[in-house]
Structure formats: structure tokens, C-alpha cells
């Protein structure tokens, strides 16, 4: 059973998949995220197609969602890992192709640095597949100069 926080926090979560029917998997994950306990889906970005970043394999389908949640960050992470596991997620090596990848990008304005969780996500500012969909739903969270730094990374809005 999840422990609810006394106040809600606006969290941003990145979604990605490149195995199986990646588009259907990401859309299902958005639906699953909307049903998490003590959580409400606020907004979802468009879907985007990107080549694997520092990896090989099929193209990824990516998106970002905004969630209003009373789950603490650690519990939210556990819920995301559960959804990944339900989609058959395996972690054989770093940047391996994946059925579903869910990452907490931002959790309110909080900074968290534990052995299992780093928020803001430590590599989010380097990746167009995160920044472009995040800027679509929360432009105030992505400085324009940051978007310009990743402009050379190919990304296609679907």
C-alpha cells in the first residue's frame, strides 16, 4: 500500500520504448500512469521517434507526461519500475533496447540524490528525446538555450 503525501507534487516522467510495438506500449504506459494510486495525469506530450542514444537497436518512441501525485518520489519510482516489469523490461546492459523505460525527470522543484534516485534526472539536459517533449507540455521548465544545445539530435514528432 502506498503512503500518500499531505500535499500534491507535480512530477514529470519520461517514457520510451524500442522493442515490440513500441508505440502501443508507450500509449498503454500513459494510460497505466493515469491510474497510479494518489496520482492524476495532468498532461501528455505528443509521441516522438528518435534513434537510440549511445546505443544500438530499433528507433525509440518517446513521450513525457506531467503527473500530479501524492506519492513520495521513492514510491513513485517503485510504481514506475513495476509498470516496466509488467511490460517485460530487462536490464542486461547499460542502454540496452527496452520494452519500456520510465524515468522521473523532475519532482516538483526538489533535488533528490540517493543511491537509487537522482532528481532532476542527471542526463535529461543532454537529450532531445526528453527535452523536446518536456518543452511541449512545460515550456517554462526547459530554457531555450538548452533546447538549442540538443538541436543536432534527430527527433520526429508523430
Where are the language model's segments positioned?
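N-terminal beta1-alpha1 ligand-phosphate binding loop
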Residues: 2-39, 45-49
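Short, structured patches in soluble enzyme cores that scaffold and shape functional sites
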Residues: 15-17, 69, 135
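Short basic (Lys/Arg) and small-residue
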Residues: 65
Amino acid at each position: 500500500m502506498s503512503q500518500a503525501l499531505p500535499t500534491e507534487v507535480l512530477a514529470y516522467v519520461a517514457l520510451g520504448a524500442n522493442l515490440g510495438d513500441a508505440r502501443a506500449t508507450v500509449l498503454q504506459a500513459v494510460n497505466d500512469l493515469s491510474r497510479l494510486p494518489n496520482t492524476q495525469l495532468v498532461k501528455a506530450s505528443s509521441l516522438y521517434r528518435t534513434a537510440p542514444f549511445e546505443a544500438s537497436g530499433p528507433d525509440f518512441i518517446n513521450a513525457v507526461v506531467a503527473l500530479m501525485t501524492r506519492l513520495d518520489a521513492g514510491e513513485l519510482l517503485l510504481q514506475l519500475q513495476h509498470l516496466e516489469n509488467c511490460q517485460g523490461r530487462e536490464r542486461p546492459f547499460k542502454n540496452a533496447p527496452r520494452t519500456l523505460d520510465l524515468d522521473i525527470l523532475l519532482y516538483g522543484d526538489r533535488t533528490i540524490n540517493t543511491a537509487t534516485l537522482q532528481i532532476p534526472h542527471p542526463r535529461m539536459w543532454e537529450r532531445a528525446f526528453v527535452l523536446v517533449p518536456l518543452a511541449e507540455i512545460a515550456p517554462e521548465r526547459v530554457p531555450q538555450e538548452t533546447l538549442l544545445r540538443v538541436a543536432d539530435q534527430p527527433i520526429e514528432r508523430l
